[in-house]
A protein has these predicted regions:
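Short, Lys/Arg-enriched N-terminal segments with co-localized hydrophobic residues
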Residues: 1-15
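OB-fold nucleic-acid-binding modules
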Residues: 38-103, 107-133, 137-295
Length: 295
């Protein structure tokens, strides 16, 4: 009798242990499920494009960065150097590659100035459109000139060129969503040659609007850039009849999606990025909507 009771007791203890084991396992799985749900409800914040580990805020303004490396920018030949030490700029994208007129490049500006960023990729506007605020970790990148235009990138053919896209993603952080009310997106209005002359070539790139000008070669037939040419220079006249001259021209790439559009006749406003080409100015419109008729 005692032996039977002892066996029964041991059997009951074994069953209880199994039940406790099952119960504990169930509680653990339930906890894991709750944790999983919590993680799902609280996704990782920050933009998926770029490097969210880059601290917000700049360590130097764009104008100060260009001045610091001016010996490698304002020179008679294309040169470059590597940016050393903690160096971050923060600004707003004022020109992207949406139309293809600015090819594999972006322009970033803060309240002090702007600079060209070379990236060896197309379709950058999908992630880095006009109005997107960015922080760029410049350490390890190269800064220099292309025809005296300040540019950040990496070395190509012994000059500063376009960085690979994976390098760009390591060095850029996107801040919030794109917005079009940043002051950097308000162009400087130019109505006379004197107002253009007041802008120093070292300030390029500059977002500008030429008011009430006429495209000299617009005849109702001529297009911005015929397909048999890589790019075309177009000239215009100011409202007072003054010619833009050889030191100022409208640049259009044959690869721009509006290159075969017929140039408008009459008075127009032309908004674009004023780039330096040695000691000349070239105006690069971002999209066809940057050229607006006045009549």
């Amino acid at each position: 009798m005692c032996s039977y009771q002892s066996k029964t007791k041991r059997k009951e203890e074994t069953i209880m242990k199994k039940l406790l084991s099952i119960l504990c396992t169930g509680l653990l799985l339930c906890g894991a499920g709750l944790t999983s749900c919590e993680n799902y409800d609280n996704p990782v914040t920050g933009n998926a494009y770029g490097n969210n580990s880059i601290p917000e805020g700049r360590t130097i303004s764009i104008a100060a960065l260009k001045e610091k490396y001016n010996d490698f920018i304002d020179t008679s030949k294309d040169t470059y150097t590597t940016i050393e030490g903690e160096t971050r700029i923060e600004g707003v994208i004022t020109c992207d590659d949406e139309s293809g007129n600015l090819y594999k490049k972006l322009v970033v500006a803060d309240e002090t100035g702007a600079i060209v960023i070379g990236v060896n990729a197309t379709g950058l506007y999908a992630f880095c459109p006009v109005g997107q605020k960015v922080v760029i970790d410049c350490k390890g990148l190269q800064i220099g000139s292309y025809r005296k235009q300040a540019q950040i990138g990496t070395v190509y053919n012994n000059a500063v060129g376009r960085m690979p896209e994976y390098v760009w993603k390591q060095h850029v952080r996107l801040i919030n969503e794109p917005k079009l009310y940043y002051s950097e997106l308000t162009p400087i209005e130019i109505t006379t040659p004197a107002e253009l002359a007041a802008i120093n070539l070292k300030e390029a790139p500059v977002l500008v609007t030429f008011k009430n000008v006429k495209l000299t070669e617009a005849d109702g037939i001529a297009t911005y850039a015929p397909g048999d040419e890589g790019s075309v220079k177009r000239y215009f006249t100011y409202a007072d009849g003054t010619e833009s001259g050889s030191n100022l021209f409208l640049y259009t790439s044959a690869y721009a999606n509006f290159s075969m559009e017929v140039m408008p006749q009459g008075s127009v406003n032309i908004t674009g990025i004023l780039l330096r080409y040695n000691n000349q100015w070239e105006v690069v419109v971002r999209t066809l909507s940057d050229i607006k008729r006045n009549n």
